[in-house]
Amino acid sequence: MADLPDNALLSSVNLPGSHDTGTASVVEDFVAQFSITSCQKYYYEEQLNIGVRSFDIRCNAQKDKASPEDVRIVHGDKKWACSDRNGNPLTLKNILDESVRFLNEHPTESIVMMVKPDDGSTEGLARAVGSFIKKEVAKGNSCRVWTGNDIPSIKEARGKIVFIRRYDIDTNKYNPADDNLNERWFGINLGRLFLRRL
C-alpha cells in the first residue's frame, strides 16, 4: 500500500480480502481439498504476508464479559472452531496481536477487519473489541486502531486497523462511552446497513 496516493479514500481502493479468514484448519469433511467448511488454505499471518488486507473475522464470545482471549474464531458455530498452525484454539487476541505486530513492521500498510458474531454473546464480542481499542488508544501516537469518525484516507489509515462490524452494540448492556470510547471506533455497522435496505 506504500505506493497508493495518501489523499485517496480507503473506500476507493480495491483491497485483496479473504472470506471466513480463520478457517485454514477447519476440515470437517473426509477429504480436505473438498472441504465445504474450510474457506482458506493459508493461516492469518500467511494471508497478511501474501498481501491480503481485508479480513472476515467470525467470532464466538463464550461469555458476556469477554476479553479478546475469550473470543474464539469460528466458522458458523462452535462446532467448527478454528485453530492456529500449532493446533491451538485461534482467538481474537491472536488475530489482533498478529495485526499489531504486522503493522509495527509495515507501517505503510492498513488492515480492514470486519468482525461478526457467528455464535455466542454479542455483548461479549463488543466488550472484547472495546478492551483492545482501549488498550491501543492508551498508546497515544502508536495506536494501531483508526479512531476517526469518517472513512479514512490512505494516509490516515496507514499503520491502522480499520474495523467494520456486523453487530449492534446494546448500550444498555455495554456502553463504549463508559470506557471513554467512541462507538464509531468499532466500525461502521454493516449489519444495520443491510437491514435498512430490506
Q: Positions of the model-derived regions?
A:
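Short, surface-exposed beta-edge/turn micro-motifs
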Residues: 110, 158-161
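Long, acidic (Asp/Glu-rich), low-complexity accessory segments flanking structured domains
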Residues: 1-54, 63-105, 110, 165, ...
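Active-site groove signature of glycoside hydrolases
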Residues: 61, 106-121
